[in-house]
Amino acid sequence: MANSAQARKRARQAVAANAHNSSLRSRLRTAVKAVRKAIDAGDKAAAAEIYKQSQVVIDSIADKKIVHKNKAARHKSRLSAAIKAMAA
């Protein structure tokens, strides 16, 4: 239990930050799922368009350090490879 005023304030801030960061992580997962769904549907043009939109979300969340930049790069790389593999 936080006993000092500073500790109580930091506890409040941590709750708010956790809620905000959770919503951003959810946006990341939703963006990745949207691309995966388009890939599974077999529509390469739609998948490529959704991928472009999801890149913005992924990069934005990595810039805010919600996820590590390497994790963001890995997501983008794997999604891009999956889209390219659709033609083959």
UniProtKB/Swiss-Prot annotation:
GO molecular function annotations of the record: small ribosomal subunit rRNA binding; structural constituent of ribosome
Keyword rRNA-binding: yes
Record keyword RNA-binding present: yes
Protein name per Swiss-Prot or TrEMBL: Small ribosomal subunit protein bS20
Chain's role: Binds directly to 16S ribosomal RNA.
Pfam families the UniProt entry points to: Ribosomal_S20p (PF01649)
Biological-process GO terms, alphabetical: translation
Keywords assigned: Ribonucleoprotein, Ribosomal protein, RNA-binding, rRNA-binding
InterPro entries for the chain: Ribosomal_bS20, Ribosomal_bS20_sf
Family: Belongs to the bacterial ribosomal protein bS20 family.
Gene Ontology terms: cellular component: cytosol; small ribosomal subunit
NCBIfam families cross-referenced by the UniProt entry: S20
